[in-house]
């Protein structure tokens, strides 16, 4: 009876198992509506439709487009801010895949739109979820993704062509310096337009990342839809010869059973199983003692 009870309790506590990996798109659609950093001489995105209709009785679509490298969801090559470092076509493919680490600073960013991620945020993550793994792709969830459809909200400014008016979160250079020195990461990313916070004029985070061969990811979408640990990130970085960056299709995959919301459940299951095991041993020993006592009588 005790074993049946144990099985029933564990079955109730176990999370549902679908047997399927979840796939989350971390990419905003590339379009003329996407935010891009205003740099003189850089055109805005344009899609020119050459044919969208029947051609010789066959439906046929073909277009050409012009795009900035650093607009919408995109990657920064190390060469973007560091002379002589990898350009887009030189990035090793193994650097485009890695375990995700999501640093949640939504509450901090809500209070301070110029919030910069600090080493204490990394410390807090490691206390709760363990050491940042080798080759990690570190992503910041500041809640800024909810603003993406409105450029004024993304840059947090009424003057979207004037970077001096921008206010949005990013990394602090001291935190990045510690991360690059003490943890062997592959990429760092944000759900905002820049790795540096909006009021930066020196772009020290970009410089540090470039000098250390770290790829940057900006305007990453749906970070709030992946677990803080346990996901794998795949970055489809456009391989433009001599490019300083470019559009990226970023995908996350993960097993729901290792995501944060399931971990507590599994801890409860393990503890419950141990307790039932101890209870079973206790009952068995108690019965053996009673049987032994009867034989003695």
Enumerate the predicted regions with their spans:
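Active-/binding-site microenvironments in catalytic and ligand-binding cores
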Residues: 2-270, 275-297
